[in-house]
């Protein structure tokens, strides 16, 4: 949202009665292929500038969460860098009551991305030991990388900070594809998750025309 001034976002939120759930750190130079910065050893200064910007912006619009994007990297130095940057982000966000999220991305859509599995994310959360660090569980990515969504949700619920969904394999509306979302939403409710869930799919046409799937849930 960084191209829009925070006061303008606040005005839109007040007008619609909505709250801002979260935002991402800047991805970097997208034209050069960046998809996050925080696990790239030689770009720590840029990563922390992006974290500072995200924290300040999130605080200004009262956003609840920030997704710190790792970027394309691998190996022990990348792990060390990402861990240090997550600690930095958690410390900066904590004073504003903001939660930091990490999200595994599938290696079909984002080959070379540092964070790809829920196991890796869970281990990072244990290592960082920050009260405001949590997992963004995207059903689309987890299904493509691991499957077994019901058990993954049950196992990881204590560290889940946000849930997103889209159909697999086309990342469309959740009324088709290989995931039974009626079952998944029931599991999420049974596990005691009461926060909002995010429909992060690719609409075919105007988004407003693709919301028919919601009728059975509202």
Residue ranges and their predicted role:
Residues 3-21, 52-59, 83-94, 148-155:
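Short amphipathic alpha-helices and their capping/turn segments at secondary-structure boundaries
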């Amino acid at each position: 949202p960084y191209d829009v001034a925070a006061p303008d976002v606040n005005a839109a939120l007040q007008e619609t009665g909505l709250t801002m759930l979260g935002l991402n750190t800047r991805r970097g130079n997208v034209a050069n292929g960046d998809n996050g910065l925080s696990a790239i050893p030689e770009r720590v200064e840029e990563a922390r500038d992006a974290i500072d910007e995200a924290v300040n912006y999130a605080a200004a619009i009262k956003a609840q969460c920030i997704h710190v994007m790792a970027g394309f990297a691998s190996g022990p130095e990348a792990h060390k860098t990402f861990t240090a940057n997550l600690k930095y982000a958690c410390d900066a966000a904590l004073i504003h009551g903001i939660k930091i999220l990490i999200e595994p991305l599938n290696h079909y859509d984002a080959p070379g991305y540092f964070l790809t599995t829920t196991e890796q994310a869970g281990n990072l959360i244990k290592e960082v030991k920050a009260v405001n660090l949590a997992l963004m569980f995207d059903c689309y990515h987890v299904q493509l990388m691991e499957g077994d969504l019901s058990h993954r949700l049950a196992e990881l619920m204590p560290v889940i900070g946000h849930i997103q969904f889209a159909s697999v394999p086309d990342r469309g509306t959740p009324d088709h594809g290989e995931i039974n979302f009626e079952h998944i939403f029931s599991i999420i409710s049974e596990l005691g998750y009461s926060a909002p869930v995010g429909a992060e799919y690719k609409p075919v046409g105007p988004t407003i025309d693709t919301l028919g799937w919601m009728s059975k849930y509202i």
